[in-house]
Amino acid sequence: MAVKLRVHPAFYRRVRHYRDRIAIHDARPQVADRFVNAAQGLVFQLLENPHRGHIAGFEPTDLADILRIAVPGFPVFAVFYRWDGQTLTVITLEHTAQDLPSRLAGIISTP
């Protein structure tokens, strides 16, 4: 059975945000390219094995089923996603120092 993939627009926005921050603000364009490739590659890996991540552990019940996995080579960044047994829903990519529960609640409440 093929896994369905849904990607929330917030994922693309955050990848672009951090890519630009690394490339421009930190003046490291090669690292920014590696970051984007690592984030995209991680989504493909999750398609093959959605159980790779672990429960994020958020208290609000509407966030209780969200999984997280670190971006390879960039451990301060994580991809947050849901897996219902058929569909992989990639929600966002965040720096782990953020106020993650409120950020994710805002994202998932927006279609």
At which residue positions do the language-model features occur?
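Exposed loop/turn and edge beta-strand positions of beta-sandwich/beta-sheet ligand-binding modules
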Residues: 1, 65, 75
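Arg/Lys-rich, positively charged N-terminal/basic patches that mediate binding to nucleic acids
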Residues: 1-40
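Generic structural signal for secondary-structure transition and capping sites
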Residues: 20, 27, 44, 48-52, ...
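A short, surface-exposed loop/turn module that caps and links secondary-structure elements
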Residues: 44-72
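Enriched for short, Lys/Arg-rich terminal
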Residues: 71-111
